[in-house]
Amino acid sequence: LLFATTACAATSPAETEPDNKTSVPAPTGPINVVASLNQWGSLAAELGGDDVEVTSIVNSTNVDAHDFEPKTSDVAKLSKAQIIVANGAGYDSWATKSMTKTTNIVSAASVMGAVEGDNPHLWFSKDARSSMATAITDAYIKALPSKKKAFQKRLKAWQADEKSLETWASEFTKSHSNLTYAATEPVVYYLMADLGFKDQTPKG
């Protein structure tokens, strides 16, 4: 009888040991996205649709992000973001300097291999816009896998619109030869280069 009781206890550990495994719920939207600049925030919003909530810290083109000082409320928004969309290249360092290693940051400079000291006005570059659209979409899919098809559909729609813009720019360049420009600031460099303009700004 003693042997039978002992054997019974030894063969039923599931009844005496608690199950500590818990299931992790699948993430649900919308994704909390914070962009440093409205230029990238508008792109993030278009690609995310109803599956994201996008806040842009700098909303006005009259504000120089170089000199911008975020308020406490701005820092709080950035710290709570699931995804931060930044420009980088020293243009908006305030947006990422206090973030942890786990913060998902999509940076135009990182995507394009630009560093501080390079022309930071990357939103004017067709290559930067295209690469950022893909990078942002990838970040969305990672954060909310259940909406993968919706994100991919929006990306394709954006790419179609961008292609139309690039086609127009290409036709413009073909019909206007030997175009030059001069500028006191490097803001429009990428845009003018994409349109085939040659920079004739005096050095020094």
Predicted regions and their residues:
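Extracytoplasmic metal-acquisition and chelation regions
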Residues: C8-G204
